[in-house]
């Protein structure tokens, strides 16, 4: 049997010298070239990992810096506790302030380099490992050469680092953000959230964007989806969309629909789950759709047409040229709606135009609406001042920059549109003038 170098290296490190050891390795225990066998195994993958005595993650043989990375991350993981609602100091911690987003970690360049080398490996980018480690029990460990760290401690340390975006080296933060799908509690999330969190994860087949997270998907959805590797992946995407809509009675997955990145040979309403630029699900932060959380009404018969009931309230007049991906794009939006020239004008609802712009671009994620967030989010006045102060210029205030980064999470991948009725909103690339 042929083995890839990494697997051969792992087996040599994992074997006992004096007794037999029983391991389950998907690359060996599943015939990857047999689609029928893969379909059967995919549907029971969750039971395999839930039933395991423990899951062992193999990162590779390691390097000279591995020991420093493991000791640094282990110590960091011992300082915090993590729950569904955030992080807090561990009862036995030696550094009670490290959990806080603004707390600077006393690491030198050597330590940061060791951490980067440790997490900058392919395992953290793979799609299938998300459900494997999410379904694993608390005994699970991560091995890198001869060095070991419990997944519990690594999970906590990565979450702690991810919350310090303003003070973590950029190269490390990029690696951490790609690994967030491993550390966030996907088993308790909606399908929409799991798809969003895993959007950067890599897989060999487009259909695995769905099949690869079935183990952590809502049971009602999983029961309706039968893995089929012999069919065109677009059919799996369509089935996933329709079955999910039937269960939740909302079109939550429309965020993956795209005219610029459509699923070939499929209707434009079929989401493209293989694209990585899907926008952030706004309801994750208590932000509603334009229609609130009202039920959708639709009908579908086999074919290409999806009949949807809606209300015609406005006509699109213009759409910003490109999606918002950076602060530069955000400033281009301000030019698109001529903020400087119209800052004293009134919006279609009667409120000041600048208030409407700030509310739209923040999706109303402001301290006035979420007072429990305190100073971690901008107020309407702070955002308006930031817009006018930094219009087309470099943001020098680190506090303002950090808060604007939080705002960017809502608008990334979206475009601004205006209507003939004098209104504005955020949309996908499928909104066209005249619609």
Question: Where are these predicted regions, by residue range?
Answer:
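Acidic/Ser/Thr/Pro-rich low-complexity tail/linker regions in eukaryotic proteins
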Residues: 22, 40, 47, 62-435
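Chitinase-like catalytic core of GlcNAc-active glycosidases
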Residues: 1-81
């Amino acid at each position: 049997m042929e083995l890839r170098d990494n697997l051969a290296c792992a087996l040599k490190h994992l074997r006992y010298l004096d007794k037999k050891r029983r391991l389950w390795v998907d690359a060996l225990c599943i015939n990857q070239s047999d689609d029928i066998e893969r379909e059967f195994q995919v549907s029971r993958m969750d039971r395999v990992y839930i039933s395991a005595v423990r899951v062992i993650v193999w990162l590779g043989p390691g390097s000279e810096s591995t020991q420093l990375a493991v000791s640094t991350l282990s110590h960091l993981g011992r300082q915090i506790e993590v729950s569904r609602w955030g992080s807090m100091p561990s009862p036995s911690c030696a550094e009670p302030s490290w959990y806080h987003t603004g707390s600077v970690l006393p690491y030198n360049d050597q330590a940061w380099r060791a951490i980067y080398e440790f997490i900058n490996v392919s395992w953290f980018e793979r799609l299938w490992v998300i459900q494997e480690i999410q379904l694993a029990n608390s005994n699970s460990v991560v091995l890198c050469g001869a060095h070991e760290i419990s997944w519990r401690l690594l999970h906590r340390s990565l979450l702690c680092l991810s919350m310090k975006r303003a003070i973590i080296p950029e190269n490390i933060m990029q690696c951490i953000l790609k690994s967030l799908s491993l550390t966030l509690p996907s088993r308790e999330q909606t399908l929409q959230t799991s798809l969003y969190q895993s959007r950067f994860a890599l897989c060999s087949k487009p259909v695995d964007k769905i099949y690869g997270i079935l183990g952590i998907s809502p049971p009602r959805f999983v029961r309706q989806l039968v893995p089929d590797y012999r069919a065109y992946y677009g059919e799996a995407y369509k089935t996933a969309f329709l079955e999910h809509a039937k269960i939740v009675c909302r079109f939550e997955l429309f965020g993956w629909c795209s005219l610029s990145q459509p699923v070939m040979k499929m209707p434009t309403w079929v989401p493209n789950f293989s694209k990585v630029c899907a926008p952030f699900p706004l309801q994750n932060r208590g932000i509603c759709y334009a229609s609130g959380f009202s039920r959708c009404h639709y009908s579908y018969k086999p074919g290409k047409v999806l009949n949807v009931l809606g209300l015609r309230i406005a006509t699109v007049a213009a759409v910003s040229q490109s999606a918002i991906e950076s602060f530069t794009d955000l400033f281009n939006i301000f030019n698109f709606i001529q903020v400087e020239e119209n800052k004293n004008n009134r919006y279609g609802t009667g409120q000041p135009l600048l208030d409407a712009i700030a509310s739209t671009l923040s999706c109303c994620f402001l301290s006035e609406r979420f007072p429990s967030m305190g100073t971690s989010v901008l107020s309407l006045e702070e955002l308006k001042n930031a817009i006018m102060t930094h219009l087309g210029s470099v943001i020098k205030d680190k506090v303002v920059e950090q808060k604007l980064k939080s705002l960017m999470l809502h608008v990334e991948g979206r475009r601004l549109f205006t209507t003939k009725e004098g209104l504005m909103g955020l949309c996908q690339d499928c909104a066209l003038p005249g619609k």
